[in-house]
């Protein structure tokens, strides 16, 4: 009996499936504008708290991001990470960084080398960026976030890495962590750059994930970016428990997102905003050069975004009011029954 069983098991071919563990490139863009984080803290506390509370929330977000990057590196030895900060004066590569010389004694020397390199460089570069942000606050420079520019730089970095690794299959995805306020006026002027990022990410098959912290209004353009690239959009109240959101919703593999229910919140608003007034419009005027959407005809007969001149005949036709027959408006027939 044992001999029969041995021959049966020896003759049976086990169907072994080779699981392909493809390395992945994770690029994270973080909105580090101190002004935005201070505004968020004031809205949540309801008091005029100073910048220290905003910096505290930003540091809590940094801790979660570092753990998230280390977890991504732990999944596969071939995984790569990139961290970009969008601050008030532009964007900066926090990791990898060409001018970094890690010398942070607060990082344990017994840590895994891959984690230690990321932690040391990120903490050092973030410390330098904090000093620059505080100096910018004292000099009262522009406090607008450059989120769209950082997203463009992130996609440029992804494209370069994919070109360098053409022989090996490498997946890529982009995660955007932004701080939202109740106004969201700065996002209106980033509409065209964000649309360009959506087109580029779609062409590269790079999914865009978004985590918005705070704010009462959803980020319309970032929602459209996640929907167009099969990404995940999450709106959380604060930085508490951020690592739990990152380690669950943002770790879903892009190849599995078509067969599972993504943790997206609500429906996507596909309407756009007027470049001049900032109002959400469903019907408006569109520039044929840069696709800028306007709810009113701009003064000077030029596009406010790309400065392209408009045809005077078309402008006159658009400003012409509808003319009724015989020049007299028709009266409504009201019949009393």
UniProtKB/Swiss-Prot annotation:
Keywords assigned: DNA damage, DNA repair, Metal-binding, Nucleus, Transcription, Transcription regulation, Zinc, Zinc-finger
Biological processes per GO annotation: nucleotide-excision repair; regulation of DNA-templated transcription
Protein location: Nucleus
Major location category of this protein: nucleus
GO cellular component: transcription factor TFIIH core complex; transcription factor TFIIH holo complex
Zinc finger (C4-type): 287-306
Pfam families attached to this UniProt entry: Tfb4 (PF03850)
InterPro entries named in the record: TFIIH_Tfb4/GTF2H3, vWFA_dom_sf
Disulfide-bonded cysteines: none
Any one Gene Ontology molecular-function term assigned to this protein's record: zinc ion binding
Quaternary structure note: Component of the 7-subunit TFIIH core complex composed of XPB/SSL2, XPD/RAD3, SSL1, TFB1, TFB2, TFB4 and TFB5, which is active in NER. The core complex associates with the 3-subunit CTD-kinase module TFIIK composed of CCL1, KIN28 and TFB3 to form the 10-subunit holoenzyme (holo-TFIIH) active in transcription.
Protein family according to the UniProt entry: Belongs to the TFB4 family.
Role description: Component of the general transcription and DNA repair factor IIH (TFIIH) core complex, which is involved in general and transcription-coupled nucleotide excision repair (NER) of damaged DNA and, when complexed to TFIIK, in RNA transcription by RNA polymerase II. In NER, TFIIH acts by opening DNA around the lesion to allow the excision of the damaged oligonucleotide and its replacement by a new DNA fragment. In transcription, TFIIH has an essential role in transcription initiation.
Listed name of the protein: General transcription and DNA repair factor IIH subunit TFB4
The gene coding this protein: TFB4
